[in-house]
């Protein structure tokens, strides 16, 4: 049973005694509020209460209490008095909105993907542009000119966020001696908000002149924001694909709404203020600490010299700057530039076991004190020591002990942007200059508004020998006119015909197929393809007068997550609502489900049938691919060639182009940011990778991840991992085409492509992260190679591989285009032809093997590492994602997204008394480890558990009996009953070789649970599932097929 909160002893919250009317205003030094509050916090650890300006604040000073407040099921953001004053300028923008406000949810869903890791990475050139302007100014001023560091960092960070997010240039470094009017108004606005927050309301109301000045400042800032919007609309830069473009053009996939003009202004102002103010403070404090800690400055400069040297700083260098990364972390620990955040409980709560708080109470997290909690950071918590923030130490810190970017869904969405910007600027400064304080006796004093910065911090910047920034920049400009090292992929455009390609996809396969089809349609015909999820169709209006192609999967008879509303709409149609719609449907079947006749291909079949019944005209019969047995790219290509194109030619009077490179001319394709594969993924950090198996068997690894606050999963859910191709595969391509890894590719395309366009990208990055290098070559790509072959014998052989010998030699040996090009030289094939023939890199899905309630904010994966192909080939055909995960080390960054489980593949809720039977082999144990962990948590909460059996198959106890000790402990606690089958040690499992043998041996107990309405969950290979299903059907006979389908739920993999 759960403990009764009423039994806890309630204690008053301590704090300094205030004065009537004035409260605690005399306890705070208003000129040094942060540091004087820190003294109070050390006296009243871990919590205190005081009254300021008529507002009572409960201040949190410890990591333990903060951890409670970070539970978003108990607490939510409180818009404190200071933020309430900011609302006069930003209204319900992302930072100042209340949780319940509609515009916050709308803006958050639209804009979070715009700050995804790949989008941030692509902003590096613009960041570098502004940072070089800072360095050029310092170089021109010379070593004897005092520099106001805070002012210059303010110019840098404002110009950076404006250029990267909105394509707007403030040109702050070209307005000599003065700030842009926006900055002046912003500084006054923030300072006034801080001032009003310290004054009783009756005094604040008398400050008429100050209020008038504030309104003028708000008007000026919002006018600047309107000018930014107007300029974008007038220039019609619809290919910018930046934050402003997202705000102006995107619609929310959940509600269908777009941001209003006023909401756009609110959020532009929010980003311009919050997007530069705290980052300029971070840089200022970081440089201050380096200037006053010579040992740290020397180490930092040494690291930059080792990693970057005299090269131009690139995005690849940043991940290698471990010490600089630690410097920034340690700086924000000691001086969090956004000093805190506030929450309030949903209902009365007891925190710390004895302090009562109520809804409406302002619980203010004082980060400067929390980050110095001696219980976490020790006796030297007040000292600047970057070494404590190296990855290996940082990852071992207790949860919620470092929170400079806030918490949960209300945390800063621009964190990755700010981090990349600050790291790059700091590295560029240390590469180019030696710094020294103007006043070597300088004592830190804070300049406080609603953020904090050093006050009156001046330094000299002496250019380092051989590091002339001006000469380097001129050299870059000169070199940019030469073609060497710059490869541009440009294509012609032709008179076009629109086409719409819709997809439904949980795992990314159908999305990748949709993009591949778009490329093909733009090459063979004259189509301009719009690719989007089915649920993205506005008002469910399918376009007429153009082909509509639908590519979708079916998940146990249910539509994919991004197709549910579309399917529901289809089912509501009446009469000939779809008359004039010309369509075709391609369906993917999940492995292991083809024998459920009622669900296999159910959704594609349903869509195809309903559209025909309501007046739609089929362009082609429905196509399909069983992903357990077929290569979906090959099947899609075959269906397109044999079925779709004849239908398109007849319906749209087309003449097909015979493209020699397999892709031909390109057409522009606009992919909305929430659905591009990379924008849809977030950043997770690897905590641990450990091998679970003996060296004598297939390797399986346990990967522990720290998840972003935005990912909240349940047992049974999956993580989609966007991998990188191996270095070996990338190097094979580079060697084949004789180009360097740092060769810059500039892809200009006005057509369907999943590649990054209109931005420089290195050959290494493109090949690593955007295309499938090991995908089996398709017949079309082989015919394209044959057409380009200059040798007749090679051409004939390639043509044979595309036809008669395809199944046995290409598909049978898993030959990729790379394998074939290495074996059969086709000199006329260039890198752009090759890249265009490759499908986009798609995410791989893994079931989470942990319960979120056991370790909040963390998840684990159990991965079977495919180290070689099951069948022979000319090369080691290692699994891309599994080897990528196995090669990770603590601190590695992964791109992940949450994929919800089949609603039936869920652990029954706490109120359910039905037993469960779990059956797994190998890494298929992943979801059941999560189930068992969740059951253990419930048991500790006093919940009576229904019976649970886990049947697990592996080779031998000493080889691959995964999580043995952990599961045995759970069995001893009564959480689960275990049954193991050892295929190579049958004597140790009662003569049973496989799990189906074990099930049959225990058939009496299994049937008993079945009679209690048990559900059977299975996870493993297709073959294992087939054997288990046959045995279960035999044990529970004569159960009706429909009931068996309802109570037998399987997840299978190939």
Swiss-Prot record:
PROSITE patterns: CYTOCHROME_P450 (PS00086), FAD_FR (PS51384), FLAVODOXIN_LIKE (PS50902). Heme binds at residue 412. FMN binds at residues 505-509, 585-620. Residues 499-644 form the Flavodoxin-like domain. SUPFAM superfamilies: Cytochrome P450, Ferredoxin reductase-like, C-terminal NADP-linked domain, Flavoproteins, Riboflavin synthase domain-like. Pfam families: FAD_binding_1, Flavodoxin_1, NAD_binding_1, p450. One of its GO terms (cellular component) is cytosol. Its cofactor is FAD; FMN; heme. Keywords: Electron transport, FAD, Flavoprotein, FMN, Heme, Iron, Metal-binding, Monooxygenase, NADP, Oxidoreductase, Transport. Its EC number is 1.14.14.1, 1.6.2.4. CDD domains: bifunctional_CYPOR, CYP120A1. Self-sufficient cytochrome P450 monooxygenase that catalyzes the regioselective in-chain hydroxylation of alkanes, fatty alcohols, and fatty acids, giving sub-terminal hydroxylation by acting preferentially on the omega-2 position. Produces 10-hydroxydodecanoic acid as a major product when dodecanoic acid is the substrate. Produces the omega-2 hydroxylated product, 12-hydroxytetradecanoic acid as major product when tetradecanoic acid is the substrae. Prefers fatty acids as substrates, since it hydroxylates the small amounts of dodecanoic acid formed in the presence of an excess of 1-dodecanol. In the N-terminal section; belongs to the cytochrome P450 family. PANTHER family: BIFUNCTIONAL CYTOCHROME P450_NADPH--P450 REDUCTASE, NITRIC OXIDE SYNTHASE-RELATED. This is Self-sufficient cytochrome P450 monooxygenase CYP505C3. It comes from Aspergillus oryzae (strain 3.042).
